[in-house]
Amino acid sequence: MFLPQEFIRRKRDGQPLDRDGMAAFVRGVTDGSVTEGQVAAFAMAVYFNDLSTDERVALTLAQRDSGDVLDWRALGLGGPVIDKHSTGGVGDVVSLMLGPMVAACGGYVPMISGRGLGHTGGTLDKLSAIPGYDVMPDTDAFRRTVREVGVAIIGQTARLAPADKRIYAIRDVTATVESVAMITASILSKKLAAGLDGLVMDVKVGSGAFMPTAEKSAELARSIVDVGNGAGMKTTAILTDMNQSLAPCAGNALEVACAIDYLTGKSRPARLHDVTMALSAELLVTGGLARDAAHAREKLQQALDSGAAAERFARMVVALGGPADLLDAPARHLARAAVIVPVPAPASGVVQRVDCRALGLAVVALGGGRTRAEDAIDVSVGLSALAEIGQRIESGEPLGFVHARDEAAAAHAADAIRRGYVLGDTGEAPPTLYRQIG
């Protein structure tokens, strides 16, 4: 007979946990026989005594198996089922370009994404800025879109890794969110439930990153690579910079417009392009669609230049209920804020540092993000034309523009931006890509 308290006691005392015990505990989490207090006690025991790689794999697989696990084999897809996951940040709109780009190169991308919480933006919130786009379609519509278009970006259904949802909610209120072992299991259980052959992780580093230090970001990346591969899914990770907004804008409709400009070739900001190409290329190599990174980049550039990637995005939008002319007339469909004002620099100088987290929180304060899961968001608000680290700004020139619902909100956000930028005599842009793991 399985006793949750004895299982918890073993971890409390630093003893190893076996796969059967982990599976039984997670089954209890799912069916409710393990109490909230017991989940909290387990999470705290893990926080202090950690999990070995084998234990992390066992927890991840148990959480995966707590609900539906998608199987794409019956559809006879002509390519690998692959995906990218980011630890989140500000202006991180990569998914909206990467999915269609990889699909145009022969991959199948069933991307199950989340909403934003805290200072980070969520891919689902960005897609919610597209009128009619169904971020929670039924499984048949999801599978059909992946099969016919090659990419579908949707939200997590209640039946995918339900144990993770309950465990995370308890971790969130018991000061155990920071456990790398449990972050790893949370991310990978959902990706494994999506039936992936391969995954590339984008782990952010810097002032706008989820993890507090570069060392912690690297630790998380290594854990995800080890556990993902241990669970039978080919997994690699790239550490990328989040010391400033990745795109020159932050906010839901603004970022969708940025993604459309990127796919159609109107504008491809250098930092955003570097990260998008690096992650997309690694996915093609992971999925066996390219010999090496150089070959992958060649294929991806062709997908962009030919319009094939843009066409995949347009088809995905239509398949999930959005407008057929979104790429041709984005201004017709994407909400525009009532107030748009520049934020003049208080002095001349070179941008030395940006408090990226503060920029993300400014978007939340405007109404473009949420502080509680149930909060509604305003997709029109945000920041645009943000100055980059290393860029010279003259006094009075804009550090960026605020898109707000009223003058008072605009003034508050403008003040946050001014405080978030540090100008000096010299400044050097940080690298966009740090290193690959796995």
From Swiss-Prot:
Entry's Gene Ontology BP terms: pyrimidine nucleobase metabolic process; thymidine metabolic process
UniProt xrefs under InterPro entries: Glycosyl_Trfase_fam3, Glycosyl_Trfase_fam3_N_dom, Glycosyl_Trfase_fam3_N_dom_sf, Nuc_phospho_transferase, PYNP-like_C_sf, PYNP_C, Pyrmidine_PPas_bac/euk, Pyrmidine_PPase_CS
GO cellular component: cytosol
UniProt cross-references to Pfam families, sorted A to Z: Glycos_trans_3N, Glycos_transf_3, PYNP_C
Keywords: Glycosyltransferase, Transferase
EC number, as in UniProt: 2.4.2.4
UniProt-recorded Gene Ontology molecular function terms: 1,4-alpha-oligoglucan phosphorylase activity; thymidine phosphorylase activity
Source organism superkingdom: Bacteria
SMART domains found in the cross-reference section: PYNP_C
Record field: catalytic activity: thymidine + phosphate = 2-deoxy-alpha-D-ribose 1-phosphate + thymine
Subunit structure: Homodimer.
PANTHER family hit by this protein: THYMIDINE PHOSPHORYLASE
Protein name: Thymidine phosphorylase
Gene name, Swiss-Prot/TrEMBL: deoA
